[in-house]
Amino acid sequence: MPEVDRFGRLPWLWITVLVFVLDQVSKAFFQAELSMYQQVVVIPDLFSWTLAYNTGAAFSFLADSSGWQRWLFALIAIVVSAILVVWLKRLKKGETWLAVALALVLGGALGNLYDRMVLGHVVDFILVHWQNRWYFPAFNLADSAITVGAVMLALDMFRSKKSGEAAHG
């Protein structure tokens, strides 16, 4: 069995910090520059900047609830973040892909957790749409990092399964 060094893959936490900082800076910028639901078209019929607040989870799930969801989602984010840090610490030296994936998910989770705890909602500003017919729910850099990290985790599981290795975790 490969040896785990004292800190595992924790040095990859610089990615987590970078995601968190970029997420918070971008949210502060768009909050300062845009009014609520204002759209600034970047690519006509495809991509716009907008400012929206999400009190729910992904895709505004439970956003219309009375406020209890803020604490539920915060608790989930804290537990998941702790699990990700432990998982990251236990990784072996050759598991760089997995370390990057976990660091991305962790950075995104912490970015949205900060919003939820400090502001009471998550700040979203990226809007993908097709003409005026279809709109994907607004999202932010933290959501993007979580998505990219999750896709990387899925690819790692498929790669491990295909090569006959035990799945990580």
UniProtKB/Swiss-Prot annotation:
Write down the EC number: 3.4.23.36
Q: What NCBIfam families is this protein classified in?
A: lspA (TIGR00077)
Identify which residues the record assigns to the active site: 124, 143
Any single GO molecular-function term of the entry would be:
aspartic-type endopeptidase activity
Reactions catalysed: Release of signal peptides from bacterial membrane prolipoproteins. Hydrolyzes -Xaa-Yaa-Zaa-|-(S,diacylglyceryl)Cys-, in which Xaa is hydrophobic (preferably Leu), and Yaa (Ala or Ser) and Zaa (Gly or Ala) have small, neutral side chains
TM stretches of this protein:
10-30, 41-61, 68-88, 94-114, 135-155
Q: Name one GO cellular component term.
A: plasma membrane
Please state the pathway this protein functions in, per its UniProt record. Protein modification; lipoprotein biosynthesis (signal peptide cleavage)
What HAMAP family has UniProt attached to this entry? LspA (MF_00161)
Checking Pfam families in the record gives: Peptidase_A8
How is it placed in the membrane, per its record? Answer: Multi-pass membrane protein
User: What family is this protein classified in?
Assistant: Belongs to the peptidase A8 family.
Protein name, UniProt field? Lipoprotein signal peptidase
